[in-house]
Amino acid sequence: MLNKIQQRNSDIYSMTPFNFFEDFRRNLFNDLKSNLIKTDIHETDNEYVVEAELPGIPKEDIQVNYENGVLTISGQRQIDAAIEDEKGKLIHSERSLTSVRRQYLLENVKEDEIKASYSDGILKVTLPKDSNKEIKTSIPIE
């Protein structure tokens, strides 16, 4: 069974410059996707519920802010690469730093009633809707 390098070297098309750009594009977008917070947003008549995956990030390192109709979720996890523990000295790590941030436009919210909880790597933010705020759906053209 050929490994990835052997397959690439045996492929005649691997010598083209376009393959370099394809690999670059694939790696770039895979890296970007890995730092994107995966989210489900539910809407009812009374509230929005945002459930965001933040696995491995301690609760203390997660920030939730709401300002001007925008919910911002961010978090950071850092692993010290110089640690030596019962498993031995760490000689290779791909998990040294993770920093994520995402924003969501959720307007007409009762800002003082927003609640957040974190369990098993899932952040849940409940944003009650403010029914007193007027929502304008159409603007007349003069």
Swiss-Prot record:
Gene3D superfamilies: 2.60.40.790. It holds the Pfam family HSP20. Residues 27-142 form the sHSP domain. It comes from the Bacteria. One of its GO terms (cellular component) is cytoplasm. Belongs to the small heat shock protein (HSP20) family. This is Heat shock protein HSP.16.4. It comes from Streptococcus thermophilus. The lineage of its organism: Bacteria, Bacillati, Bacillota, Bacilli, Lactobacillales.
